[in-house]
Amino acid sequence: MYIERLLKVIKAPHVSEKSSIALDKNNVIVLKVVNYVTKQDIRHAVCMLFSVKIKKINVLMVSGKSKGQRYNLGYRCNWKKAYVILKRGYTVDLMNMEQ
């Protein structure tokens, strides 16, 4: 059951200009993760899925934007983002992850 939980930790890679620059320069991958996970869960999931060594993990909560149409006001969901810094010599191919 623990392995099944680790497979659900990572939702998707966060693809943006900033994350692609971080991957090229500093060997950092940026991931969207489930809101309730801890750094240890993220560490185990990334190590298991990609077979890499991790140097450091930074996690932050991204608050949802307020969106409105005419008189209705709504909010997008909050989500968690993880910056995973890999040790030297390890790389991750994010193109295979998106499939």
UniProtKB/Swiss-Prot annotation:
Q: Note the Pfam families from the entry.
A: Ribosomal_L23 (PF00276)
Which terms does the UniProt entry file under GO BP? translation
Keywords of the record = Ribonucleoprotein, Ribosomal protein, RNA-binding, rRNA-binding
Q: Which GO terms describe its cellular component?
A: ribonucleoprotein complex; ribosome
Is Ribosomal protein tagged as a keyword? yes
| One of the record's GO molecular function terms | structural constituent of ribosome
Give the domain of life: Bacteria
What parts of the sequence cross the membrane? none
Q: What does this protein do?
A: One of the early assembly proteins it binds 23S rRNA. One of the proteins that surrounds the polypeptide exit tunnel on the outside of the ribosome. Forms the main docking site for trigger factor binding to the ribosome.
What subunit structure does UniProt give?
Answer: Part of the 50S ribosomal subunit. Contacts protein L29, and trigger factor when it is bound to the ribosome.
Q: Which family does it belong to?
A: Belongs to the universal ribosomal protein uL23 family.
Protein known as: Large ribosomal subunit protein uL23
The species this protein belongs to is: Blochmanniella floridana
This protein's gene is called: rplW
